[in-house]
A protein has these predicted regions:
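Intrinsically disordered, low-complexity proline-rich tandem-repeat tracts
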Residues: 5-13, 17, 23-26, 31, ...
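Conserved beta-strand hairpin/beta-sheet module of binuclear metal-dependent hydrolase folds
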Residues: 41-90, 206-218
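Short, structured coil segments at secondary-structure junctions
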Residues: 46, 119-120, 256
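Residue-level marker for buried hydrophobic side chains located in beta-strands
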Residues: 70-72, 101, 124, 213-215, ...
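Metallo-beta-lactamase
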Residues: 76-78, 166-171, 175, 184-187, ...
């Protein structure tokens, strides 16, 4: 089955027995007072029409033209005020968002899109193979048990606390999600070109817009859980198929771009092939 087993409730995590050689994992009440991931969302101009927003633990991208804004990914549910703030800094309101384009439907990328779709009727698009995931017909996401087994590690404890605070436990989808077609893409700000990049999820898709590769989680440059900074893959625990993630690097290497806007981490400038080679070297 493409779907992973439904994640247990967090009440179950409180009674999950830790291994004897490790400190007991904190209860999720304790996570509420754990140290926060530092920093405010940073707005970074990439081109005249593309802005990267680096949130606390995830990024989103704003693409503008004279018709409005295309939002690529939307952070956690709890990132909504930061998303709205990034729009306001460019002079836009929620109603100016023409559409939301998802690289994939994990909660840290789909989160505030739920609000835009329900409150403003904002169209939400993704690759056809990701539509069912966005609607929550199934869920391809790391289970809470997998996370619980790792929160004895400081980085995992801090990151997990951020997930809890940011609404990362909800299982809501967006029933109105539609598949992105070439015709739809041609009418959106920036005229994004889909670059199918499965692995992190079965229907993950990156986008080329104004010469910039918006890679989602197919290729990142950093994450609160990772010490290394620079082009790399996310840990295999977060992906539907790590082998497909590695294969996808070859497809991304063919993209004609010298700018990488990742789903996590900082903006990266240089030939995309160099970024994919660096990520592949780390994955081996």
């Amino acid at each position: 089955s493409r779907s992973r087993p439904a994640a247990p409730g967090f009440a179950a995590l409180a009674i999950a027995p830790p291994k004897k050689s490790r400190p007991a994992a904190p209860g999720f009440a304790a996570l509420a007072i754990a140290p926060k991931i530092a920093g405010m969302a940073e707005l970074v101009q990439v081109t005249d029409t593309v802005h990267l927003v680096q949130g606390h633990a995830v990024n989103w991208t704003l693409v503008t033209d004279d018709t409005g804004v295309l939002l690529i990914d939307a952070g956690y549910p709890g990132d909504r005020e930061e998303v709205l703030g990034s729009l306001r800094r460019l002079g836009y309101q929620p109603g100016d968002v023409r559409a939301i384009l998802l690289t994939h439907a994990h909660i840290d990328h789909l989160g505030s899109a739920i609000w835009f779709a329900s409150e403003h009727g904002t169209p939400v698009y993704c690759h056809p193979r990701e539509v069912g995931h966005a609607k929550r017909d199934y869920l391809e996401q790391v289970s809470t048990i997998d996370v619980a087994l790792r929160i004895w590690r400081p980085r995992w404890a801090v990151w997990t606390a951020h997930v809890v605070r940011s609404g990362g436990l909800i299982r809501d989808g967006i029933p109105s999600t539609q598949p992105l077609t070439a015709e739809v893409a041609a009418g959106l700000p920036g005229r994004p070109e889909a670059v199918f990049s499965p692995g992190h999820t079965n229907g993950h898709c990156s986008y080329l817009v104004d010469g910039v590769l918006v890679s989602g989680d197919a290729l990142i440059t950093g994450h609160p859980l990772l010490r290394h900074r620079g082009p790399q893959l996310l840990p295999a625990i977060f992906s539907y198929s790590q082998q497909d993630c590695i294969h996808t690097l070859s497809a991304l290497a063919e993209v004609d771009s010298d700018v990488l806007v990742p789903g996590h981490g900082q903006l990266w400038r240089g030939p995309i092939r160099e970024a994919t080679e660096a990520a592949l070297a780390l994955a081996r």
